[in-house]
Regions:
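Conserved N-terminal catalytic/coupling substructures associated with nucleotide/phosphate chemistry
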Residues: 1-127
Length: 127
C-alpha cells in the first residue's frame, strides 16, 4: 500500500506509474493497464508527475470525478480494452498535500482473462 503522505519517496518502476493527466486521460494509460494486468499488477497515479530527481510530486486535478467517469466509459468498451478486471474500489480520488489525484489499482489478471490487450488487437498486448 502506498503512503500518500510520503509520495515523494516513490519512483516509477514496474509496479507504479505516474501520469500528469491535466489535459485528460493520457493515451498511454491503456498500455500501462495492459502491462500491469498481464504481469504482477500495479498502481497508476493520475495527477502525479515525476520530477527531475525521479521522485513524485502531485498536481491538482481540477475535475477528478469527470476523469474517473471517462476512465470507466473507456475501460468498459471492448473495442478499446479486451477486458475490464477492475472493481469500483480499485479507482478512487486521494488527497495529497491539498491536491486531488486519482489512484487506479490494477490487479494481476486471472489466467482466463489473459492476455489483456488494447485497441481490439491482440498484438497490442503489453508486459
Amino acid at each position: 500500500m502506498l503512503d500518500f503522505n510520503r509520495l515523494e519517496q516513490y519512483r516509477e518502476n514496474n509496479r507504479i506509474e505516474a501520469k500528469k493527466a491535466l489535459g485528460g486521460l493520457p493515451k498511454s494509460i491503456w498500455e500501462t493497464y495492459s502491462a500491469f494486468a498481464n504481469t504482477l499488477g500495479g498502481v497508476i497515479l493520475l495527477g502525479v508527475i515525476e520530477t527531475a530527481d525521479k521522485t513524485f510530486d502531485s498536481v491538482n486535478l481540477p475535475n477528478p470525478d469527470s476523469l474517473i467517469r471517462e476512465f470507466w466509459r473507456i475501460i468498459n468498451n471492448p473495442l478499446k480494452v479486451s477486458v475490464n478486471i477492475l472493481a469500483g474500489k480499485d479507482v478512487y480520488v486521494e488527497e495529497v498535500d491539498g491536491d486531488r489525484i486519482i489512484v487506479i489499482k490494477v490487479p494481476r489478471a486471472d489466467r482466463a482473462d489473459k492476455p489483456v490487450y488494447v485497441d481490439n488487437d491482440i498484438r497490442n498486448t503489453y508486459r
